[in-house]
């Protein structure tokens, strides 16, 4: 195995490789964040398995297994790029969840309260944004693809993670979008934009959603853009129990990712067990 010390100069070429692999901006930001932390902590040290195992132990002491694994995936990719395949480490074992904690799962009723709270605050844009994510299941990073042209066609062509898929807009949503576009005098391009005309970013949306919690009487732990995507998945699956079709709609390459989205709450799990009536 070649000998080389960990250096900050190793990061830019890896960043270029991620760009050439057509990774999304959000994915690149996440990967580079973890790699920079790894390099900053151990710069100047020889790259070997012991170094990476030490890093893994540090992650295990600081983060939950799922968060630690995200960091390990980024650093393993960085090591492979530089030819240190033998230094890569295995992820932490994570037990498959049987149900979703109720304090993290947004219900349909809570979603409705959030939309109403946005309308009460005279935030038509935020209310429509919530409805758009929840009615289509798109990622928050894919919102820029909800354009004036998409609202006219009734479908959006989304490019994400090296794949292209068509997202259909329900007729009721299409009507609302067109009315909003007309009212805001948006001529073309993304519908959800800031005052300067730029597409809203993840942090703007997150902050505005969190501001609705108290008025809507919804726990902040449930209010994230991704919670709306999960709610879409559960509602769709309750109508059509086709997880493969749902994976295609959500843009998942791995069907196991989709299965995580449709896990029910502990209360629902308990209700199903009660209906079995196996205690004599």
Feature annotation, model-predicted:
Residues 1-280:
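Conserved catalytic core of the tyrosine transesterase superfamily
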């Amino acid at each position: 195995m070649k000998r080389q010390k960990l250096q900050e100069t190793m990061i830019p070429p890896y960043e270029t490789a991620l760009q050439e692999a057509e990774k999304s901006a959000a994915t690149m930001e996440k990967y580079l964040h973890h790699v920079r932390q790894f390099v900053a902590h151990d710069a100047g040290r020889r790259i070997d398995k012991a170094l990476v195992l030490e890093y893994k132990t540090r992650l295990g002491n600081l983060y939950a297994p799922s968060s630690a694994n995200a960091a390990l995936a980024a650093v393993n990719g960085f090591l492979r790029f530089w030819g240190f395949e033998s230094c890569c480490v295995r992820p932490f074992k994570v037990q498959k969840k049987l149900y979703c904690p109720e304090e993290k799962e947004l219900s349909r009723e809570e979603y409705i309260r959030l939309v109403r709270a946005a309308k009460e605050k005279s935030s038509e844009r935020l209310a429509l944004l919530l409805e758009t994510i929840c009615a289509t299941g798109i990622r928050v990073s894919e919102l820029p693809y909800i354009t004036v042209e998409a609202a006219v066609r009734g479908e959006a062509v989304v490019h994400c993670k090296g794949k292209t898929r068509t997202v259909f807009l329900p007729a009721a949503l299409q009507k609302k979008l067109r009315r909003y576009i007309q009212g805001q005098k948006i001529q073309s391009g993304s519908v959800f934009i800031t005052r300067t005309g730029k597409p809203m970013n993840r942090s703007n949306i997150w902050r505005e959603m969190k501001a609705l919690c108290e008025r809507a009487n919804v726990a902040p732990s449930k209010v994230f853009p991704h919670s709306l995507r999960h709610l879409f998945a559960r509602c769709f699956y309750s109508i059509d129990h086709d997880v493969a079709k749902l994976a295609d709609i959500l843009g998942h390459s791995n069907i196991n990712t989709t299965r995580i989205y449709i896990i029910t709450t502990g209360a629902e799990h308990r209700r199903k067990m009660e209906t079995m009536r196996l205690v004599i």
